[in-house]
């Protein structure tokens, strides 16, 4: 996402080099969406994997509509739109089959059975291999799997976003659904690289995110200070510690940290070598109640847990 939109200026050459470096390191899951850009991130991923398709699991999403100029156009889970969106994504990606196709947000105006039914037709047509949902509630997951197996649920999960713990993760495990954790580094905050809003580019959407605002920002800096302290004691970076915590939550949870630079991807990959003790985990668990602010503005919060 950050390679094309939301996080400041894009640099396609650097981004493609970063994707290639990720593949070199054995990273296989590449996550995109038709709204990133909008549309241009799928094209970027398509260029990056064109000569290395067998090394990549390509996941994309539909359902949040944006105009070419970036304007938000709402949520759409209607069957005819599902088919249209998939064909457009296939063309932009330049692939014959999408490995994992998500509904980006649940459409409250369309029964999930209808949306997933249309997605299942894409599997039958050979256009999609596996189906996923994003930010879906437990009851929605149960209704969805009654229509077609759901391979993955993608939802925000990190040291500073613990909402999935409890019923949501339990439901995924009960139904055999893998969990893909987006923003596992707290939109970059947990890396410790941001000390004020001035560290973010002018076009960076985080400037409007509640957790990056005013008092919330200052309180969350205290959380990051503790992450930095614990990381130093482990001999790793704060980002690696935050990812190691995700890995420690279970083998069925896959984090997808966003990166635009090869060196950051290499840093993140290093998290797989870090083992956390019970004491480490207890210290990190204590940070959750200290996080300040909602993860989205009011409009965005209405679209999660659908």
Task: State where each predicted segment sits.
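N-terminal binding-site loop/beta-alpha segment at the start of enzyme catalytic domains
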Residues: 1-56, 60, 304-305
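Active-site beta-loop-alpha junctions enriched in small/polar residues
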Residues: 1-3, 33-35, 61-65, 103-106, ...
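N-terminal small/glycine-rich loop or linker at the start of catalytic domains
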Residues: 1-7, 59-73, 97
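Conserved, mostly hydrophobic/aromatic
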Residues: 15, 30, 45, 58, ...
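Generic structural signal for well-ordered alpha-helices
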Residues: 19, 42, 46, 86-90, ...
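Glycine/proline-rich, positively charged
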Residues: 69-163, 167, 178
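Aromatic-lined glycan-binding groove of carbohydrate-active enzymes
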Residues: 164-202, 237
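Terminal-tail/helix-coil boundary detector
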Residues: 174, 202-233, 248-253, 260-262, ...
């Amino acid at each position: 996402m950050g390679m094309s939109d939301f996080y400041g200026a894009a640099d396609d050459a650097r981004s493609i080099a970063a994707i290639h470096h990720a593949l070199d390191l054995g990273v296989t899951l590449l996550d995109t969406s038709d709204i990133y850009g909008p549309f241009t991130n799928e094209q970027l991923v398509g260029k990056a994997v064109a000569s290395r398709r067998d090394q990549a699991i390509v996941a994309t999403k539909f359902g949040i509509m944006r105009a070419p100029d970036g304007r938000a156009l709402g949520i759409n889970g209607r069957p005819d739109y599902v088919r249209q969106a998939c064909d457009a994504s296939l063309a932009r990606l330049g692939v014959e089959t999408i490995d994992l196709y998500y509904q980006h947000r649940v459409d409250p105006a369309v029964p999930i059975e209808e949306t997933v039914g249309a997605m299942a037709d894409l599997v039958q047509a050979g256009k999609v291999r596996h189906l996923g949902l994003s930010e879906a509630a437990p009851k929605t997951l149960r209704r969805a799997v009654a229509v077609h197996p759901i391979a993955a649920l993608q939802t925000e999960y990190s040291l500073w976003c613990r909402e999935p713990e409890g019923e949501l993760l339990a439901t995924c495990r009960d139904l055999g659904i893998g969990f893909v954790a987006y923003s596992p580094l707290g939109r970059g905050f947990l890396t410790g690289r941001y000390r004020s809003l001035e560290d973010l580019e002018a076009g960076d959407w985080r400037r409007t995110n509640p957790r990056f605002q005013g008092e919330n920002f200052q309180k969350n800096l205290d959380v990051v200070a503790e992450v930095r302290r614990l990381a130093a004691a482990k001999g790793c970076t704060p980002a690696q510690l935050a990812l190691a915590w995700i890995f420690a939550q279970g083998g069925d949870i896959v984090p997808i940290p966003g990166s635009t630079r090869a060196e950051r991807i290499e840093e993140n990959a290093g998290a797989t070598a870090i083992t956390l003790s019970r004491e480490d985990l207890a210290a990190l668990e204590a940070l959750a109640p200290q996080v300040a602010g909602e993860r989205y503005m009011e409009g965005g919060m209405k679209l999660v847990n659908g």
